[in-house]
């Protein structure tokens, strides 16, 4: 006899009914368990589907962010437009400013380019960007370190003026009573930037002493002098540690050449035995770069244009020539560098650079562009103008 399942004849009618009821409940329970399994499987399927969709959405967003950053680093205005169109940014100037302030994946030079434009939106973003900085209880050098690290200062005088004016206003707002006017903060900021260059640029031989720094800043505090101990602290801070200027993202020069002033093939006279070699020239950021091939990431040579002049010149072997030279130091080597055959960076040996174009028109266009690029460092003119403004108030 099966002890687990007794024969119906052995059970009473009541026991038979109880057995049937148990079997029915067991069947219902198994069905309920199966329903729960099906529902759980459905929930997990929905979760998997949601996670897959979320991952896909996040992957798409990350892809769009990457594209937007690349666009911004090549053309800041188009990059911001792309971010807004893809709802990665709102058109609100505060939102744009915070995005630039965080700067994730953004080129600091491109940030400076965008902030320097005169478009009303850009001016509002500049103000909001400066307001992102907290300068309270920082001395001026500390504040400048923070500010000048957040973007790369452009080269045009008007852009620098607007940016430093906004900085001076913000600093004085965060530190009331330190200076008598924003003009004082503005002038002293430029004095510190120029001091940084004079103390740490290897090409500057004359290192200014503290006394000269004091003399530079006499009368800038609405006609009176700033406390000497205040100037001493600022001087010592810069002397012990130069400003950290943002390097181009990616540690290469690639992005520098996205929007050059001029580029093209030219012939350059050089070498121990003077020969003409075809080189790809790029004019940008007050420098003339030349490459062996257009696809090269690193230039064969770099010619800083500061203090140089350019002129047409006749050459017996090549037509349409121009010459780069130093008008105040004829016969001396021009400050420049190049890579030698072993790939080492060495100092250039040219007293002048002779370059040949393919036509008179092309030569004249290069001369015009180079002359436009050869500019004085604008800081001195800006400081001089502001000092005159301070003096006129006395």
Swiss-Prot record:
Membrane topology: Peripheral membrane protein
Gene3D superfamilies given in the database record: 1.10.220.20, Arf Nucleotide-binding Site Opener,domain 2 (1.10.1000.11), Pleckstrin-homology domain (PH domain)/Phosphotyrosine-binding domain (PTB) (2.30.29.30)
The protein's name in its UniProt record: Cytohesin-4
Domain PH: 259-375
Listed InterPro entries: PH-like_dom_sf, PH_domain, Sec7_C_sf, Sec7_dom, Sec7_dom_sf
Any GO BP: regulation of ARF protein signal transduction
Gene Ontology CC annotation, any one: intercellular bridge
One term of GO molecular function: guanyl-nucleotide exchange factor activity
């Amino acid at each position: 006899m099966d002890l687990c399942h007794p024969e119906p004849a052995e059970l009473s009618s009541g026991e038979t009914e109880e057995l049937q009821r148990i079997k029915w409940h067991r069947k219902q329970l198994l069905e309920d368990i199966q329903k729960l399994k099906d529902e759980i499987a459905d929930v997990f399927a929905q979760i998997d589907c949601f996670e897959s969709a979320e991952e896909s959405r996040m992957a798409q967003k990350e892809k769009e962010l990457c594209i937007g950053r690349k666009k911004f680093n090549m053309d800041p205005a188009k990059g911001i437009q792309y971010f807004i169109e893809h709802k990665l940014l709102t058109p609100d100037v505060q939102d744009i400013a915070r995005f630039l302030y965080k700067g994730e994946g953004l080129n600091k030079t491109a940030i400076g380019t965008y902030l320097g434009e005169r478009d009303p939106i850009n001016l509002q973003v500049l103000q909001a960007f400066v307001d992102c900085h907290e300068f309270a209880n920082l001395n001026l050098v500390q504040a400048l370190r923070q500010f000048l690290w957040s973007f790369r200062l452009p080269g045009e005088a008007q852009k620098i003026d607007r940016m430093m004016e906004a900085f001076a206003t913000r600093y004085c707002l965060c530190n009331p009573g330190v200076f008598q006017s924003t003009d004082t903060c503005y002038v002293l900021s430029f004095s510190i930037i120029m001091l940084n260059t004079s103390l740490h640029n290897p090409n500057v031989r004359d290192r200014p002493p503290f006394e000269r720094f004091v003399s530079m800043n006499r009368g800038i505090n609405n006609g009176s002098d700033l406390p000497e101990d205040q100037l001493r602290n600022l001087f010592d801070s810069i002397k012990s540690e130069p400003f950290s200027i943002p390097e181009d993202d990616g540690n290469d020069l690639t992005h520098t050449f996205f929007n050059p002033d001029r580029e093209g093939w030219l012939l350059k006279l050089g070498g121990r035995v003077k020969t003409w070699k075809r080189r790809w020239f790029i004019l940008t950021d007050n420098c003339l770069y030349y490459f062996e091939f257009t696809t090269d990431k690193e230039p064969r040579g770099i010619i800083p244009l500061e203090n140089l002049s350019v002129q047409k010149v006749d050459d017996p072997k090549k037509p349409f020539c121009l010459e780069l030279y130093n008008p105040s130091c004829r016969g001396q080597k021009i400050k420049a560098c190049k890579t030698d055959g072993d790939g080492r960076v060495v100092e250039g040996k040219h007293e002048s650079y002779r370059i040949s174009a393919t036509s008179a028109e092309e030569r004249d266009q290069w001369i015009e562009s180079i002359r436009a690029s050869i500019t004085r460092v604008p800081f001195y003119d800006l400081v001089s103008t502001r000092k005159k403004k301070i003096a006129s108030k006395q």
